[in-house]
């Protein structure tokens, strides 16, 4: 953290009153409690969250738990940081203040008001936009907003007049954007999933002209799918007409943002966890889109989800056929082994096992791509036991595809610890 322990390491003496009495670190967000003592907000928040009801320094009982920002001290600390910049001290940023409960209640009241002569759609949307700004600032703000019945209000606004609401409505856009920042409960997710009209509306939002609405719609679908525990309700969502096409469009769009890609792969993975509708993903073109994206620009977590989705779809014969037709599938799966993470290796090995079991051509491609060497390294690595089992099964499948001068005939293989076939 800027201005935390680094100045001490440089031999610079931090003024006593700039240190938090709890952590002894330079304060970045000083606040004063009812006893008049000042602490760093993070430290005193943790102290109170642990159930303590006294001042850490004076041991006097707190008359209330209000934290008052000490702007004067914070500015003095910032000036000190600037004065010591040449010594490697970075200026602490001006912290954003936590949401005020009274303001949150007022904004939610304005957002939920009935549109009429005194309250316009624009003013309601503006109230939700301000709440969204607060929610983006911190998890504490999100908890505060959710604690004032915000999710129920937002769901009611979002799904009001489903048949007549304009999909590009500012009110729909803002309420959707805020809702996906809050954590819906299992009951709330199942209430949405159990209503076919609401599921249909979420699916229609995937085809809106606004990319932000489409991305947030996919985020809401993923949230509801993950939150609802009933498989029957998950099936209602994954079976919604064109839902796979809408989510996959986020992945194949060449101008997709990093957030769109991340939410898109999370949503398609959640949809493909529903076994009964995986064939819809295949018919919607998921195999080609997934391989193209995996070969291009996923980060590690997204790569893991993408590979997990590939393995799920390879459990269907039509999935194996579709992936097998893509020229990059087998080489990409082989390349992934031991390159990304243990999970990625396990999923890639699982997909290759399904592909090589289904088609001799895939076995030949895998052997030509150097899979044998990768598998021999894998079974002797610290990877997961599941990955090693898949590797050994693949080795058995591939032995007939190994050329005469391959690893199988080398001294290295004879000395390896691979279990005999």
Swiss-Prot record:
It catalyses: S-ubiquitinyl-[E2 ubiquitin-conjugating enzyme]-L-cysteine + [acceptor protein]-L-lysine = [E2 ubiquitin-conjugating enzyme]-L-cysteine + N(6)-ubiquitinyl-[acceptor protein]-L-lysine. It is an enzyme of class 2 (transferase). Gene3D superfamilies: Leucine-rich Repeat Variant, Zinc/RING finger domain, C3HC4 (zinc finger). It comes from the Eukaryota. Keywords: Transferase, Ubl conjugation pathway. One of its GO terms (biological process) is protein ubiquitination. Functions as an E3 ubiquitin ligase. Pathway: Protein modification; protein ubiquitination. One of its GO terms (molecular function) is ubiquitin protein ligase activity. CDD domains: RING-Ubox_PUB. This is U-box domain-containing protein 26. The gene is PUB26. Residues 13-87 form the U-box domain.
């Amino acid at each position: 953290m800027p201005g935390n322990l680094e100045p001490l390491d440089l031999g610079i003496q931090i003024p006593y009153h700039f240190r938090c009495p709890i952590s002894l670190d330079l304060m970045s967000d000083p606040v004063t409690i009812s006893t008049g003592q000042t602490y760093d907000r993070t430290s005193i928040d943790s102290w109170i969250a642990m159930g303590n009801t006294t001042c850490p320094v004076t041991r006097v009982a707190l008359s209330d738990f209000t934290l008052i920002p000490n702007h004067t001290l914070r500015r003095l600390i910032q000036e000190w940081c600037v004065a010591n910049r040449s010594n490697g001290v970075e200026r602490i940023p001006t912290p954003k203040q936590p949401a005020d409960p009274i303001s949150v209640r007022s904004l939610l009241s304005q957002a939920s008001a009935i549109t009429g002569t005194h309250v316009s759609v624009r003013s309601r949307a503006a109230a939700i936009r301000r709440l969204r700004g607060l929610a983006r600032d911190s998890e504490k703000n999100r908890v505060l907003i959710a604690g004032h019945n915000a999710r129920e209000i937002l769901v009611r606004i979002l799904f009001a007049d489903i048949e007549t609401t304009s999909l590009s409505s500012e009110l729909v856009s803002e309420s959707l954007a805020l809702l996906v920042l809050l954590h819906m409960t299992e009951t709330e997710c199942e209430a949405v999933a159990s209503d076919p009209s609401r599921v249909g509306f979420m699916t229609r939002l995937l085809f809106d002209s606004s990319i932000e609405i489409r991305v947030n719609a996919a985020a809401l679908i993923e949230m509801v799918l993950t939150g609802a525990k009933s498989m029957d309700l998950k099936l209602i969502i994954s079976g919604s007409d064109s839902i796979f096409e809408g989510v996959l469009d986020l992945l194949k769009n060449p101008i997709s943002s990093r957030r769109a890609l991340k939410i898109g792969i999370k949503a398609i993975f959640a949809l493909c966890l529903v076994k009964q509708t995986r064939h819809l993903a295949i018919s919607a073109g998921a195999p080609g889109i997934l391989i193209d994206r995996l070969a291009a620009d996923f980060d590690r977590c997204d790569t893991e989800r993408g590979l997990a989705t590939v393995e799920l779809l390879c459990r269907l014969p039509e999935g194996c056929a579709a992936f097998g037709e893509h020229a990059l599938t087998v080489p990409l799966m082989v390349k992934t082994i031991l390159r990304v993470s243990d999970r990625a290796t396990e999923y890639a090995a699982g997909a290759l096992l399904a592909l090589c079991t289904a088609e001799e051509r895939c076995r030949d491609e895998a052997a030509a791509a150097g899979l044998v060497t990768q598998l021999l390294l894998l079974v002797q690595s610290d990877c997961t036991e599941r990955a090693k089992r898949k590797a050994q099964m693949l080795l058995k499948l591939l032995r007939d595809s190994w050329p005469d001068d391959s690893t199988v005939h080398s001294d290295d293989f004879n000395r390896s610890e691979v279990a005999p076939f």
